[in-house]
Amino acid sequence: MTQHPPGDDRTNRIVAVTLDEESIGRSGPDIEHERAIAIYDLVEENLFAPEGADGQGPFTLHLGITANRLMFDIRKEDGTPVVTHLLSLSPFRRIVKDYFMICDSYYNAIRTATPDKIEAIDMGRRGIHDEGSRTLQERLKGKVRVDFETSRRLFTLITVLHWKGEGQ
């Protein structure tokens, strides 16, 4: 078997993601579809290296909301606990609220608006998504190293958790 050095992308990655069912509750087909795509994309391609565990993966990730905090329960592939991080949801509340509002506008526009209007709304949606992704990267700094694309996919999952958490 070939040994890979610490920090190699084969070890610093997520191989499975679960969402806390109590955090997400029931949602419509659009949200379920977004969740499935985000999990698939995240597992297919990511960079995820918990501080102090660089090169010890691959890892599994369980996301949830507990005590009004975002929970990252990180384990090795065999289930051995690595670390659990609890992040305040406060920095994400406005971004997620704005994201939901623009997503509603986007889904409504798809039915009736011109292609130019739909494209403009989608650009705004992507901009807010990027802002949430950067905020997540900042909040994880010193805890878990992630690249921007991994942060984007994780932010999508955070919005799914907020869907129930915000009473949507």
UniProtKB/Swiss-Prot annotation:
Q: Give the matching NCBIfam families.
A: PRK02853.1
* Official protein name in the record: UPF0262 protein BBta_0898
Q: Which cysteines does the record link by disulfide bonds? A: none
Supply the source organism for this entry. Answer: Bradyrhizobium sp. (strain BTAi1 / ATCC BAA-1182)
Query: Member of which family?
Result: Belongs to the UPF0262 family.
Query: Taxonomic lineage per UniProt?
Result: Bacteria, Pseudomonadati, Pseudomonadota, Alphaproteobacteria, Hyphomicrobiales
